[in-house]
Amino acid sequence: MSTITPGYEIAADGTAYNLTGRAGAPTVVLIHGLGLCRHMWQDHIADLAADYQLLTYDLLGHGDSAAPSQQTTLSLYAQQLLGLLDDLQIEQAAVVGFSIGGMINRRFALDYPHRLSALAILNSPHDRGAAAQALVETRAAAVRVDGAMATMEAALERWFTPAFRETNPGLMEMVREWRRRVDPHSYAEAAWVLATGVTELTRPAVPIKTPSIVITSANDTGSTPDMSVAIAAEIETAELSIVPDLQHLGLLEQPQAFTQPVIDFLRKLAL
């Protein structure tokens, strides 16, 4: 049972969510990235809502959701999604995940494949190589000492093109505010999952068979085109799309460059 609060609803486990779009249509779930929240999808919803029921929610400890009551893992995040689908009596959904969200939906596909109709994995990591892996782990470890905001400005430089940063100061401040709102311990735990969780997803013993599309930005230095090629190669019949010019959070710069390939893919599946 869910309780209604102004602007969103709260599930039994404390997950904040919105269920919008076309009631009774196939469900599309949108999972945000580390230090963000469900509102990152606000410019994608209009295009999706005409044909789909949309479920956006905050990861545990993020946005308006409660902090997790146990150690944060990809499996815990997958269980959060499972519980929400059960709570809403949604038997099957297409799940779109950005960055760590694309790790969560892969974990969900490995653990609960019968609950998925499709996957869209956006700007999500694969094997990083030793040097890049060490850098990501160092960054994640520093958060425990210095706090989440210590790496914020460097993150914005990695995430957005210089011209977009300069001409959209309001959006930059909104992204900062999303991170400020994350429970500090939850952020540190999630950062470590993002840094180290890839190893449990690569080369799985039983490959993901859910129809999938893998998308990243040409200039994403953390979830590179080569990583997306590798992710797609490990999923049977996965499609691949590389969006030119953009960086890690390109889906906030050019929403339709990401939403339209997802919509086209879902239509091919008659969803």
Cite the ranges covered by each PLM segment.
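Short beta-strand/loop motif that positions the catalytic acidic residue
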Residues: 208, 214-216
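Alpha/beta-hydrolase fold catalytic core
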Residues: 1-28, 50-53, 90-91, 199, ...
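Acidic catalytic loop of the alpha/beta-hydrolase fold
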Residues: 218-223
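Conserved acidic catalytic loop of the alpha/beta-hydrolase fold
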Residues: 75-93
